[in-house]
UniProtKB/Swiss-Prot annotation:
HAMAP family the UniProt entry points to: RfcS (MF_01509)
Record function comment: Part of the RFC clamp loader complex which loads the PCNA sliding clamp onto DNA.
CDD domains recorded: AAA, HLD_clamp_RFC
Top-rank taxon, per record: Archaea
SMART domains registered for this protein in UniProt: AAA
Oligomer status and interactors: Heteromultimer composed of small subunits (RfcS) and large subunits (RfcL).
Recorded GO CC terms: DNA replication factor C complex
Protein name: Replication factor C small subunit
């Protein structure tokens, strides 16, 4: 059975990691010196935090990396018992081979409860001689200050377009795919700097056709073309509510888009609209209100229709 491409083409070493050149340079220095502090990786999903941690471990330990590296997903195991058992049991044992210390990687550590984070802080202090921690999170503000102060913080930004394009072209060549310019642009648009999402969309599109086109990408990603969102928005702004709502229903039914997906795309289109700054502010407020109501459980079609109606009377 074929592996997911995100795993098949995951970089094995730090020099292979795409983008984040300054971060990779600092991590490589840690490997060369065989010395590092506790680390905190923050950034949105799919930007390379887990890949960097795994590559660091493989470069640091070589063949014994599995014995000296423990990976836990804190969103699945977020309670204090995990810190008291799995983490502590691994941290208290000496490293295998000539490794100076072990590494524990806590992915999505911002999901840890407050009690679990306090227990983790004590564990980090107690076993600092033989163990280092790498914490990965989407929201560093959810990590308690005592842990943040014990870590060197690395902020992973969304990947640049050129890095995404280079990697997508490389994978397409290895998989003997024809990647059209429109297909690349569409993947860049739907992925928003998320390499994991970009590769997953590419693999899904490749299952449909060996030639990856713009139309296929938007279809498999359940996203609308930016011009379709712009058309719907412009109709609403011009007071053509019925036509705008018809376009909305086409997106939801024909493309299978959720209300949240449509809202996000409308929000991304706001800066490009030919309306005043004041109207853009009011529109963003209306989008935020619509998003809140949908999250609270309101009917998506009704709320999005109400948003389109508000667009026609913006002041």
């Amino acid at each position: 059975m074929q592996k997911p491409w995100v795993e098949k083409y995951r970089p094995e070493t730090l020099p292979e990691v795409v983008g984040h050149h300054e971060i990779i340079k600092r991590l490589t220095n840690y490997v060369e010196k065989k010395s590092m502090p506790h680390l905190l990786f923050s950034g949105s999903p799919g930007v390379g935090k887990t890949t960097a941690a795994l590559a660091l471990a493989k470069d640091l330990y070589g063949d014994t990396w599995r014995e000296n590296f423990l990976e836990l997903n804190s969103s699945d195991e977020r309670g204090i018992d995990v810190i008291r058992t799995k983490v502590k049991d691994f941290a208290r044992t000496k490293p295998i081979g000539d490794a100076p210390f072990k590494v524990i990687f806590l992915d999505e550590s911002d999901a840890l409860t407050s009690d679990a984070q306090n227990a983790l802080r004590r564990t980090m202090e107690k076993y600092s001689d033989i163990c280092r921690f790498i914490l990965s999170c989407n929201y560093p503000s959810k990590i308690i200050p005592p842990i943040q102060s014990r870590c060197a913080i690395f902020r992973f930004s969304p990947l640049k377009t050129e890095d995404l394009v280079e990697n997508l072209k490389d994978i397409s060549e290895k998989e003997t795919l024809t990647l059209e310019k429109g297909g690349i642009d569409a993947i860049i648009y739907v992925s928003e700097g998320d390499m994991r999402k970009a590769i997953n969309v590419l693999q899904t599109a490749a299952a449909v056709s060996d030639t990856v086109t713009e139309e296929i990408v938007y279809k498999v990603a359940s996203k609308a073309r930016p011009d379709e969102i712009k058309k719907m928005t412009q109709l609403a702004l011009n007071g053509k509510f019925v036509e705008a709502r018809e376009q909305l229903y086409n997106l939801m039914i024909d493309w299978g888009m959720s209300g949240e997906d449509i809202l996000i795309q409308v929000f991304r289109e706001v800066p490009n609209l030919d309306i005043s700054e004041k109207e853009k502010v009011h529109l963003v407020e209306a989008i935020g209100e619509c998003d809140f109501r949908i999250v609270e459980g309101s009917n998506e079609r009704i709320q999005l229709s109400a948003l389109l109606a508000k667009m026609g009377i913006l002041e």
